[in-house]
A protein has these predicted regions:
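Contiguous, often N-terminal, cationic amphipathic patches that form binding interfaces
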Residues: 1-43, 47, 51, 56-70
């Protein structure tokens, strides 16, 4: 399953908001440097989907990402 993720970096608090079945808005405390924010986004999505494989498909350098969960 492919989901769209809109990421806000350097946030005060981490949170996940599900806008629709395939659109999430994720705020992370990490800065968008050295892939730290991307790694944290993947960790958060894994926590929400235990036992599933999570892979970043598109948007490595963009706040709009496409992630494969499955």
């Amino acid at each position: 399953m492919l989901i769209k993720v809109r990421v806000t970096t350097d946030a005060r608090a981490e949170k996940v908001v599900k806008k629709s079945d395939d659109l999430y808005v994720v705020s992370v405390k990490e800065k968008a440097e050295r892939n730290m924010a991307n790694r944290r986004v993947i960790e958060i999505i894994k926590e929400k989907n235990p036992g599933k494989r999570v892979k970043l498909i598109k948007g490595h350098h963009s706040p709009a990402k496409i992630v494969e969960v499955g």
